[in-house]
């Protein structure tokens, strides 16, 4: 039986337009996992596991509401609550896997299909570094491969972006290529553009290992990148906003508080990468070794350039 799940290799690009120009790009890989194939993938692949540790893994608790219900069941409930009927069609999750036990996804996307394969809806699951998540469930109105959708920002994700923003999504349905582009706009115009672009690969042990060697500890690099880029923005003089809660509007920090926070921003990149579930034996030692490598990335100006 041929798999519908795939591996995608590509890059993420961020371009901040206001209040200070700032951009970066780095290479990553993602898995597009058919939720109905997870038991089969767990049996067929040697280096990937579902809900158990391996070189690469997917843990249900890293997504959705973190509860005991399956990701498929949670997605179905969300769709039903929005009056979206897929007729039981496939749902595929685009995400980065845990690598050596560590995983962080700034955004995961559920592609929800009708039985005939047409897209019915997209679920955008946004994660922040405070451990919070919010899911935007948006129906697909058009029948083409390119999907355009929009929603209001609902989760505090960056101390350098206010809450009163609108997200515009431009997504291509997964094929040989994949694009997920996001534009964040406020009252004064566009403040941020970001895009994920990737090429499809078969999901095999060999391709997973190739991607893993090409982009080691990608999730740790992503977390380190978030804090490193935050530091660069702070050094450029962009106002640092205090988080007032999951849905609250952030307020600017007093300059003295910004100075006290500087050490926290510097330390966070290396500290975050050690916040993982310990693995036994060689895998645990390898993760610690890789963590030391990633811990130095915040000192390099070009650390996340291709």
Task: Name each model-derived stretch.
Residues 1-270, 306:
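Mature, function-bearing regions of proteins
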Residues 22, 294-295:
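Coiled-coil-like amphipathic alpha-helices with heptad-repeat character
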Residues 268, 277-281:
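Intrinsically disordered and other compositionally biased segments
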Residues 273-278, 287-293, 299-303:
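Alpha-helix boundary/capping motif
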